[in-house]
Amino acid sequence: MTAKNVGLPSTNAKLRGFIDQNFSPSKGNISLVAFPVSSTNSPTKILPKTLGPINVNVGPQMIISTPQRIANSGSVLIGNPYTPAPAMVTQTHIAEAAGWVPSDRKRAREFIDSDFSESKRSKKGDKNGKGLRHFSMKVCEKVQRKGTTSYNEVADELVSEFTNSNNHLAADSAYDQENIRRRVYDALNVLMAMNIISSLPTGKKRNQVDCNSAQECQNLEIEKQRRIERIKQKRAQLQELLLQQIAFKNLVQRNRQNEQQNQGPPAVNSTIQLPFIIINTSRKTVIDCSISSDKFEYLFNFDNTFEIHDDIEVLKRMGMSFGLESGKCSLEDLKIARSLVPKALEGYITDISTGPSWLNQGLLLNSTQSVSNLDPTTGATVPQSSVNQGLCLDAEVALATGQLPASNSHQSSSAASHFSESRGETPCSFNDEDEEDEEEDPSSPE
């Protein structure tokens, strides 16, 4: 669409003249073209300063260009409001120019963003994951492989690896030898702070993970062995208490039968009240006995060895426990002994009748022997024959060697001032260590 009448205002706001000219594709010097602008808010248009101040109201959709003679008569000059350079379009395509084509040039902000992203990508590409995390992993692998090594040894190996052309590092890489050694030093400090590796007095680094695992495993095995020994001790105490109950109840039944046969209680001088102790010594022994006024304290002085037996030991020797402590109990006696204890404890009586071997029943002797073979202080192994020899000892010798805690009441000792501990192994006379063990292990048979 072309305009026929054009008015050019002068500086004094008067119309200078009119030009009436019919524009055709072949003639004409000046062409004014108006085309619709999109509905979006377009920025403010800046008119050329060559026209001077203009008082005529011109709409934002009109673009006025200065009159110029165009070499090609079939073309018009159209100014693009978003590009500083004019564009040449033919007159036949004016009707199709409903909008403008954005320029291919990027804005300054786009250039900044693209440059920043490219530089960021280039930095990331240069780093190639070779940060402190990467070096820490490499250092940890080196220390784990060697077990014990030094800083210089690890740094030299990593420098030789990363400076090699086969490891994707160029000669001008930022990770030169000094940088690699610095990162190795930082990685070692981080790993030591995390207790993954430890430093030795000689300056060497040791893989603490493997050392801690081995030490923890050794500590667990020692703790397992200690608990197995506690279980054996608890079983020995349970056995002693059950034998006491069986002996007392069997004695009560025998006295009841004697009263029925004799049709009355025995004479006063023919009975011994429980509890009691028996002191046995040689006839040539000189005994000095002192008794307190209330007859609650007795002081004996012997010039020779003597034996002391309590009532439980005497009852066992009389056969009141049916020979359960030695494993020589018949089926009939075993049936009677099971009837003298609560039903929940009958299974223990059956186990006790098998002899002292029931103390180790259900315990992993193989694992305990393997643990006992290992010296926790030096890590050296003890010969297997010495361990098996210790397990074959009787209860009293095993108690002395510390391998098998058991009661001393099975055999009487001829040592001076030696008391039988069969009655002493009651819950009331446990030492402080046993009381602590009971608090830790509430599921014990007691």
UniProtKB/Swiss-Prot annotation:
Residues 229-261 are annotated as: DCB1. InterPro entries: E2F-DP_heterodim (IPR037241), E2F_WHTH_DNA-bd_dom (IPR003316), TF_DP_C_sf (IPR038168), Transc_factor_DP_C (IPR014889), Transcrpt_fac_DP (IPR015648), WH-like_DNA-bd_sf (IPR036388), WH_DNA-bd_sf (IPR036390). Expressed in all tissues examined. Highest levels in spleen and heart. It is found in: Nucleus. GO terms for biological process: negative regulation of DNA-templated transcription; regulation of cell cycle; regulation of DNA-templated transcription. Residues 274-330 are annotated as: DCB2. Residues 60-82 are annotated as: Interaction with CEBPA. It holds the Pfam family DP. A motif (DEF box) lies at residues 176-210. The modification Phosphoserine is found at S24, S42, S122. Can stimulate E2F-dependent transcription. Binds DNA cooperatively with E2F family members through the E2 recognition site, 5'-TTTC[CG]CGC-3', found in the promoter region of a number of genes whose products are involved in cell cycle regulation or in DNA replication. The TFDP2:E2F complex functions in the control of cell-cycle progression from G1 to S phase. The E2F1:DP complex appears to mediate both cell proliferation and apoptosis. Blocks adipocyte differentiation by repressing CEBPA binding to its target gene promoters. This is Transcription factor Dp-2. The lineage of its organism: Eukaryota, Metazoa, Chordata, Craniata, Vertebrata. The gene is Tfdp2.
